A protein has these predicted regions:
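Active-site pocket-lining/capping segments in soluble small-molecule metabolic enzymes
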Residues: 1-78, 96-97, 104-247, 254-264
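Conserved nucleotide-cofactor-binding alpha/beta core module
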Residues: 81-82
Length: 264
Protein backbone atom coordinates (compact mmCIF):
# COMPACT_ATOMS: atom_id res chain seq x y z
CA UNK A 1 0.00 0.00 0.00
CA UNK A 2 0.98 3.65 -0.12
CA UNK A 3 2.27 3.70 3.47
CA UNK A 4 4.56 0.75 2.78
CA UNK A 5 5.82 2.38 -0.40
CA UNK A 6 6.62 5.63 1.41
CA UNK A 7 8.39 3.71 4.16
CA UNK A 8 10.38 1.74 1.61
CA UNK A 9 11.51 4.85 -0.25
CA UNK A 10 12.60 6.55 2.98
CA UNK A 11 14.41 3.39 4.13
CA UNK A 12 16.30 3.05 0.84
CA UNK A 13 17.35 6.69 0.81
CA UNK A 14 18.45 6.54 4.46
CA UNK A 15 20.83 3.73 3.46
CA UNK A 16 22.18 5.52 0.41
CA UNK A 17 20.25 3.42 -2.11
CA UNK A 18 17.99 4.34 -5.00
CA UNK A 19 14.47 3.09 -5.52
CA UNK A 20 12.59 3.00 -8.81
CA UNK A 21 8.80 2.61 -8.95
CA UNK A 22 7.40 0.47 -11.77
CA UNK A 23 4.40 1.92 -13.57
CA UNK A 24 4.82 0.04 -16.80
CA UNK A 25 1.27 -0.89 -17.75
CA UNK A 26 -0.14 -0.50 -21.27
CA UNK A 27 -3.46 1.06 -20.22
CA UNK A 28 -6.85 1.05 -21.86
CA UNK A 29 -8.66 4.38 -22.09
CA UNK A 30 -10.50 3.83 -18.81
CA UNK A 31 -7.28 3.85 -16.80
CA UNK A 32 -6.12 7.16 -18.24
CA UNK A 33 -8.87 9.04 -16.41
CA UNK A 34 -7.35 8.73 -12.94
CA UNK A 35 -3.72 7.95 -13.74
CA UNK A 36 -2.16 11.31 -12.92
CA UNK A 37 -4.27 11.68 -9.78
CA UNK A 38 -3.20 8.23 -8.63
CA UNK A 39 0.46 8.87 -9.42
CA UNK A 40 0.75 12.28 -7.74
CA UNK A 41 1.18 10.94 -4.18
CA UNK A 42 3.75 8.44 -5.49
CA UNK A 43 5.77 11.18 -7.18
CA UNK A 44 5.60 13.29 -4.02
CA UNK A 45 7.27 10.45 -2.07
CA UNK A 46 10.42 11.15 -4.06
CA UNK A 47 11.33 7.92 -5.87
CA UNK A 48 14.49 8.19 -7.93
CA UNK A 49 12.70 7.28 -11.16
CA UNK A 50 9.54 5.80 -12.62
CA UNK A 51 9.85 2.71 -14.81
CA UNK A 52 7.38 3.16 -17.66
CA UNK A 53 6.60 1.64 -21.06
CA UNK A 54 3.54 3.30 -22.60
CA UNK A 55 4.37 6.38 -24.74
CA UNK A 56 1.10 8.09 -23.83
CA UNK A 57 1.63 7.73 -20.10
CA UNK A 58 5.23 8.87 -20.47
CA UNK A 59 4.00 12.00 -22.24
CA UNK A 60 1.44 12.67 -19.50
CA UNK A 61 3.98 12.22 -16.70
CA UNK A 62 6.56 14.45 -18.38
CA UNK A 63 3.95 17.17 -18.85
CA UNK A 64 2.65 16.94 -15.28
CA UNK A 65 5.88 16.08 -13.43
CA UNK A 66 8.71 17.39 -15.64
CA UNK A 67 11.41 16.82 -13.01
CA UNK A 68 10.61 13.12 -12.48
CA UNK A 69 13.23 10.89 -14.16
CA UNK A 70 11.79 8.12 -16.32
CA UNK A 71 13.37 4.75 -17.14
CA UNK A 72 12.00 2.84 -20.11
CA UNK A 73 10.69 -0.58 -19.06
CA UNK A 74 11.71 -3.85 -20.68
CA UNK A 75 8.03 -4.13 -21.62
CA UNK A 76 8.60 -1.41 -24.23
CA UNK A 77 10.58 -4.10 -26.11
CA UNK A 78 13.52 -1.94 -27.17
CA UNK A 79 15.42 -4.08 -29.68
CA UNK A 80 17.81 -1.71 -31.48
CA UNK A 81 19.95 1.42 -31.13
CA UNK A 82 17.61 3.57 -33.25
CA UNK A 83 14.81 2.98 -30.74
CA UNK A 84 17.18 3.88 -27.90
CA UNK A 85 18.04 7.16 -29.65
CA UNK A 86 14.33 7.87 -30.12
CA UNK A 87 13.64 7.47 -26.42
CA UNK A 88 16.73 9.50 -25.55
CA UNK A 89 15.35 12.40 -27.60
CA UNK A 90 12.04 11.97 -25.74
CA UNK A 91 13.82 12.64 -22.45
CA UNK A 92 14.19 9.08 -21.15
CA UNK A 93 17.20 8.74 -18.85
CA UNK A 94 17.65 4.96 -18.95
CA UNK A 95 16.50 2.16 -21.25
CA UNK A 96 15.99 -1.39 -19.97
CA UNK A 97 16.75 -3.42 -23.08
CA UNK A 98 14.68 -6.31 -24.38
CA UNK A 99 15.60 -9.68 -22.91
CA UNK A 100 15.70 -11.25 -26.38
CA UNK A 101 18.87 -9.39 -27.43
CA UNK A 102 22.21 -11.12 -27.92
CA UNK A 103 25.39 -9.90 -26.25
CA UNK A 104 26.66 -8.58 -29.58
CA UNK A 105 23.45 -6.61 -30.10
CA UNK A 106 23.75 -5.08 -26.63
CA UNK A 107 27.36 -4.14 -27.41
CA UNK A 108 26.33 -2.46 -30.66
CA UNK A 109 23.62 -0.47 -28.88
CA UNK A 110 26.18 0.63 -26.30
CA UNK A 111 28.54 1.73 -29.08
CA UNK A 112 25.84 3.64 -30.98
CA UNK A 113 24.33 5.23 -27.85
CA UNK A 114 27.28 6.11 -25.59
CA UNK A 115 25.39 8.76 -23.61
CA UNK A 116 22.31 6.70 -22.67
CA UNK A 117 22.10 4.64 -19.50
CA UNK A 118 21.48 0.99 -20.37
CA UNK A 119 20.08 -1.72 -18.13
CA UNK A 120 20.07 -5.44 -18.93
CA UNK A 121 18.27 -8.40 -17.36
CA UNK A 122 20.68 -11.10 -16.19
CA UNK A 123 18.32 -13.43 -14.32
CA UNK A 124 14.65 -14.35 -14.32
CA UNK A 125 11.81 -15.84 -16.31
CA UNK A 126 11.26 -15.24 -20.01
CA UNK A 127 7.88 -14.39 -21.51
CA UNK A 128 6.42 -16.82 -24.02
CA UNK A 129 4.66 -14.31 -26.27
CA UNK A 130 3.78 -10.72 -26.97
CA UNK A 131 1.14 -9.60 -29.45
CA UNK A 132 2.63 -10.20 -32.89
CA UNK A 133 5.77 -11.77 -31.41
CA UNK A 134 4.76 -15.37 -30.70
CA UNK A 135 7.71 -17.73 -30.37
CA UNK A 136 6.10 -20.79 -32.00
CA UNK A 137 6.45 -19.71 -35.63
CA UNK A 138 10.03 -18.59 -35.10
CA UNK A 139 10.96 -21.77 -33.26
CA UNK A 140 9.33 -24.25 -35.64
CA UNK A 141 9.69 -22.53 -39.03
CA UNK A 142 12.33 -19.85 -38.39
CA UNK A 143 9.74 -17.30 -39.59
CA UNK A 144 9.30 -14.32 -37.28
CA UNK A 145 5.67 -13.20 -36.77
CA UNK A 146 6.88 -9.66 -36.07
CA UNK A 147 8.49 -9.57 -39.53
CA UNK A 148 5.19 -10.34 -41.25
CA UNK A 149 5.90 -14.03 -41.86
CA UNK A 150 3.83 -15.77 -39.16
CA UNK A 151 2.85 -19.33 -40.10
CA UNK A 152 0.07 -19.58 -37.48
CA UNK A 153 1.76 -22.52 -35.77
CA UNK A 154 -0.68 -22.15 -32.88
CA UNK A 155 -3.49 -23.44 -35.12
CA UNK A 156 -1.82 -26.65 -36.26
CA UNK A 157 -2.61 -30.13 -34.99
CA UNK A 158 -0.14 -31.71 -32.57
CA UNK A 159 0.08 -35.30 -31.30
CA UNK A 160 1.67 -36.26 -27.99
CA UNK A 161 4.13 -39.15 -27.70
CA UNK A 162 5.32 -40.57 -24.41
CA UNK A 163 9.12 -40.68 -24.16
CA UNK A 164 11.92 -41.82 -21.90
CA UNK A 165 15.38 -40.46 -21.29
CA UNK A 166 18.29 -42.55 -22.56
CA UNK A 167 21.59 -43.16 -20.79
CA UNK A 168 23.19 -40.27 -22.66
CA UNK A 169 20.34 -37.88 -21.89
CA UNK A 170 18.63 -38.14 -25.28
CA UNK A 171 14.84 -38.39 -25.36
CA UNK A 172 13.56 -41.58 -26.99
CA UNK A 173 9.91 -41.98 -28.08
CA UNK A 174 8.12 -44.91 -26.46
CA UNK A 175 6.34 -47.19 -28.92
CA UNK A 176 2.66 -46.81 -28.08
CA UNK A 177 -0.55 -45.21 -29.30
CA UNK A 178 0.63 -41.69 -30.10
CA UNK A 179 -2.71 -39.90 -30.29
CA UNK A 180 -3.23 -37.04 -27.85
CA UNK A 181 -6.26 -38.85 -26.41
CA UNK A 182 -4.08 -41.79 -25.42
CA UNK A 183 -1.81 -39.69 -23.22
CA UNK A 184 -2.67 -39.96 -19.55
CA UNK A 185 -4.06 -36.63 -18.42
CA UNK A 186 -2.89 -35.01 -15.20
CA UNK A 187 -5.63 -34.65 -12.59
CA UNK A 188 -4.92 -32.92 -9.25
CA UNK A 189 -5.74 -34.95 -6.13
CA UNK A 190 -5.77 -34.37 -2.39
CA UNK A 191 -2.35 -36.05 -2.05
CA UNK A 192 -0.73 -33.82 -4.66
CA UNK A 193 2.97 -33.46 -3.93
CA UNK A 194 3.21 -36.65 -1.88
CA UNK A 195 5.13 -39.71 -3.01
CA UNK A 196 7.69 -40.07 -5.75
CA UNK A 197 7.78 -37.55 -8.62
CA UNK A 198 6.53 -38.82 -11.96
CA UNK A 199 9.23 -37.13 -14.07
CA UNK A 200 7.46 -38.07 -17.28
CA UNK A 201 8.44 -36.71 -20.67
CA UNK A 202 6.11 -36.18 -23.61
CA UNK A 203 7.14 -35.29 -27.14
CA UNK A 204 4.85 -33.06 -29.19
CA UNK A 205 4.78 -33.70 -32.93
CA UNK A 206 3.12 -31.53 -35.55
CA UNK A 207 1.17 -33.68 -38.00
CA UNK A 208 3.06 -32.58 -41.13
CA UNK A 209 6.48 -33.01 -39.46
CA UNK A 210 6.79 -36.69 -38.53
CA UNK A 211 9.88 -37.40 -36.49
CA UNK A 212 10.36 -33.79 -35.33
CA UNK A 213 9.66 -33.79 -31.60
CA UNK A 214 9.34 -30.98 -29.05
CA UNK A 215 9.73 -32.11 -25.42
CA UNK A 216 7.28 -31.32 -22.62
CA UNK A 217 8.16 -32.37 -19.08
CA UNK A 218 5.81 -33.52 -16.33
CA UNK A 219 6.47 -33.92 -12.62
CA UNK A 220 4.20 -34.40 -9.61
CA UNK A 221 2.77 -30.90 -10.06
CA UNK A 222 1.74 -31.10 -13.71
CA UNK A 223 2.94 -30.58 -17.29
CA UNK A 224 4.96 -27.55 -18.35
CA UNK A 225 4.25 -26.95 -22.03
CA UNK A 226 4.56 -23.16 -21.93
CA UNK A 227 7.43 -22.99 -19.42
CA UNK A 228 10.64 -21.65 -20.95
CA UNK A 229 13.96 -21.99 -19.18
CA UNK A 230 14.87 -19.02 -17.02
CA UNK A 231 17.37 -16.47 -18.18
CA UNK A 232 20.70 -17.01 -16.41
CA UNK A 233 23.48 -14.69 -17.57
CA UNK A 234 25.82 -14.76 -14.59
CA UNK A 235 28.57 -16.09 -16.85
CA UNK A 236 28.23 -12.95 -19.01
CA UNK A 237 28.23 -10.33 -16.25
CA UNK A 238 31.92 -9.51 -16.74
CA UNK A 239 31.45 -8.90 -20.46
CA UNK A 240 28.37 -6.76 -19.87
CA UNK A 241 30.33 -4.65 -17.40
CA UNK A 242 33.23 -4.31 -19.83
CA UNK A 243 30.97 -3.11 -22.64
CA UNK A 244 29.64 -0.36 -20.37
CA UNK A 245 26.18 -1.51 -19.31
CA UNK A 246 25.13 0.75 -16.43
CA UNK A 247 22.86 -1.61 -14.50
CA UNK A 248 22.11 -5.33 -14.23
CA UNK A 249 18.55 -6.35 -13.44
CA UNK A 250 17.26 -9.38 -11.56
CA UNK A 251 13.60 -10.30 -11.82
CA UNK A 252 11.83 -9.71 -8.53
CA UNK A 253 8.15 -9.46 -9.43
CA UNK A 254 6.16 -12.38 -7.96
CA UNK A 255 9.39 -13.59 -6.31
CA UNK A 256 10.15 -13.62 -2.59
CA UNK A 257 12.59 -11.25 -0.92
CA UNK A 258 14.74 -14.30 -0.16
CA UNK A 259 14.86 -15.31 -3.84
CA UNK A 260 15.89 -11.84 -4.98
CA UNK A 261 18.49 -11.46 -2.23
CA UNK A 262 20.06 -14.87 -2.81
CA UNK A 263 20.15 -14.31 -6.56
CA UNK A 264 21.85 -10.95 -6.11
Amino acid sequence: NMDNLAEGIDFAHAHGKKIFVASNIMPHNSKLKTYLKDMRPVVEMGPDALIMSDPGLIMMVKDEFPDMPIHLSVQANTMNWASVKFWQRAGIERVILSRELSLDEVAEIRQQCPDMELEVFVHGSLCIAYSGRCLLSGYINKRDPNQGTCTNSCRWKYDAHEAKEGDNGDLIPVARDSSADAVEQFEPTTDLGLGDPTDKVYLLQEETRPGEYMPAYEDEHGTYIMNSKDLRAIQHVHRLAEMGVDSLKIEGRTKSHYYAARTA
